[in-house]
């Protein structure tokens, strides 16, 4: 595990010691090298886990998320160059250091083999994210967004700490590898119901569950581009990962406790998709679409069948790359037009034809067009939820239709129509931006050729 963690730590001195004109090039190329190392973890030759040390392990659930995390750092650096071009040098270096620190915490969170260690790192990811949002965001509302983000996450995860200490007290260990062999069924008592809620709430807030999702659109809209990318792509996946890890402890209570949360997710999925249809703000639309996709993952994890777990893992990876790409596209519009309102950015296809192609591809992957892995994940989730209850097929069908509607609405509003006069002399798309979009789309297309490497622990 150290062969990823130590190079990531060494990125920080690299940032501070590079020449001013070489900072971006050095950190990006080095970050890409680290992400290539992490691809080795995707090859899981045997059924049991890779125990790198007492603290770190990697299995077929954490490996895809680990690869996604390392892959995203160079992409964030590529996307942030324009945003930081006017900043003084030290502030640029601080920003890059924050991103590297966040990546370090995320890598360690996904590979921690002990639940308390996992919890500490899960909370540590909050600090760099908060600094990135509140220091480099665009509007003054970013402070409000940071407060929302901080308090929602902390209020959700403090009960988890108490619950973990309680579990540790009567189990004697919180190591993932030990827990598997100690599973005693939790009976339906009030104390166990509260234990279940305390364990799940932290991850439900992080996912976010409909009703606890108010921090997400705020944080996404106010964050700078790298903040939005890492929030959508990796931080939401922490919730799904934590849920998949901790549900094994809480059986058979989950079967009994999952109903209200399933209902809330299925209802919230349709509600947030419908909210997307009446958004004027581009970033806000993409943020709400993330909530609706993550609701599918919550449903899948709570059903607890092998198929639904496979669907949840595939959907998490697919959504990470897709939403990150959409945020990059929204940002490239914002850098030219200086507004997130979609109506002001209409008719861009005539001015930026290549960008329009990227918009089309990103929208199609977002609405889960075959043969992308978004479709594979959604199919698994839809099929497993149908076998859990037949009624869900109606809700899932409505959701898929609305998803297609808002994806195409986003595409048509920004790309078609007559462009307004204030955007006649905008800059053309840079090679950097085209490379960025390619690096988002390439993994999505390549994974559709061999989806089994991201189907998680069951496959």
Curated annotation (Swiss-Prot):
Pfam families per record: Oxidored_q5_N, Proton_antipo_M
The record ties this protein, via InterPro entries, to:
NADH4_N, NADH_Q_OxRdtase_chainM/4, NADH_UbQ_OxRdtase, ND/Mrp_TM
List the signal peptide residues.
none
Q: Could you tell me where this protein is found in the cell?
A: Mitochondrion inner membrane
GO cellular component annotations of the record: mitochondrial inner membrane; respiratory chain complex I
- Residue ranges spanning the membrane: these are 22-42, 60-80, 93-113, 114-134, 147-167, 193-213, 224-244, 256-276, 284-303, 308-330, 351-371, 391-411, 435-455
In alphabetical order, the GO MF annotations are: NADH dehydrogenase (ubiquinone) activity; ubiquinone binding
GO terms of biological process kind: aerobic respiration; electron transport coupled proton transport; mitochondrial electron transport, NADH to ubiquinone; mitochondrial respiratory chain complex I assembly
Indicate whether Electron transport appears among the record's keywords.
Answer: yes
Q: How does it sit in the membrane?
A: Multi-pass membrane protein
UniProt subunit comment: Core subunit of respiratory chain NADH dehydrogenase (Complex I) which is composed of 45 different subunits.
Q: Tell me the function of this protein.
A: Core subunit of the mitochondrial membrane respiratory chain NADH dehydrogenase (Complex I) which catalyzes electron transfer from NADH through the respiratory chain, using ubiquinone as an electron acceptor. Essential for the catalytic activity and assembly of complex I.
Listed NCBIfam families: NDH_I_M
Name listed for the protein in its UniProt record: NADH-ubiquinone oxidoreductase chain 4
| Species of provenance | Canis lupus familiaris (Dog)
């Amino acid at each position: 595990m150290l062969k990823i963690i130590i190079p990531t730590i060494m990125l920080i001195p690299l940032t501070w010691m590079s020449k001013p004109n070489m900072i971006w090039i050095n950190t990006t190329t080095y970050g890409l090298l680290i992400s290539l190392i992490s691809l080795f973890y995707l090859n899981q030759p045997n059924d049991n886990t890779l125990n790198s040390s007492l603290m770190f392990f990697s299995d077929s659930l954490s490996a895809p998320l680990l690869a996604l995390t390392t892959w995203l750092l160079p992409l964030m650096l590529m996307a942030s160059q324009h945003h930081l071009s006017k900043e003084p040098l030290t502030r640029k270096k601080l920003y890059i250091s924050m991103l590297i620190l966040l990546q370090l915490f995320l890598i360690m969170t996904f590979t921690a083999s002990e639940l308390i260690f996992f919890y500490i790192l899960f909370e540590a990811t909050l600090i760099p994210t908060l600094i990135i949002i509140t220091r480099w965001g665009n509007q003054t509302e970013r402070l409000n967004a940071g407060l929302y983000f901080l308090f929602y996450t902390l209020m959700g995860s403090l009960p988890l700490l108490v619950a973990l200490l309680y579990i540790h007290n009567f189990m004697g260990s919180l190591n993932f590898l030990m827990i598997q062999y100690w599973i005693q069924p939790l009976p339906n008592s009030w104390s166990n119901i509260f234990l279940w809620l305390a364990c799940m709430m932290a991850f439900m807030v992080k996912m976010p569950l409909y009703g606890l999702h108010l921090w997400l659109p705020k944080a996404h809209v106010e964050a700078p581009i790298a903040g939005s990318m890492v929030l959508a792509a990796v931080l939401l996946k922490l919730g799904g990962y934590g849920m998949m890890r901790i549900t094994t402890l809480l059986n058979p209570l989950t079967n009994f406790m999952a109903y209200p949360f399933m209902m809330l997710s299925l209802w919230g999925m349709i509600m947030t998709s419908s909210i997307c249809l009446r958004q004027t703000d581009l970033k806000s639309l993409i943020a709400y679409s993330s909530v609706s996709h993550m609701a599918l993952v919550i449903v899948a994890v709570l059903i607890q069948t092998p198929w639904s777990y496979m669907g949840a893992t595939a959907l998490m990876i697919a959504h990470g790359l897709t939403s990150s790409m959409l945020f990059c596209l929204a940002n490239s519009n914002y850098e030219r037009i200086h507004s997130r309102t979609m109506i002001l950015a209409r008719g861009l296809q005539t001015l930026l034809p290549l960008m329009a192609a990227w918009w089309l591809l990103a929208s199609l992957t977002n609405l889960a067009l075959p043969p992308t892995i978004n479709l594979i994940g959604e199919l698994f989730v839809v099929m497993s939820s149908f076998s859990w209850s037949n009624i869900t097929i109606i809700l899932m069908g409505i959701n898929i239709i609305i998803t297609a509607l808002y994806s195409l609405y986003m595409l048509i509003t920004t790309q078609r129509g007559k462009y307004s006069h204030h955007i006649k002399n905008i800059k053309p798309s840079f090679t950097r931006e085209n490379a960025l979009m390619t690096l988002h789309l390439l993994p999505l297309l390549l994974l559709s050729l061999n989806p089994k490497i991201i189907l998680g622990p069951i496959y």
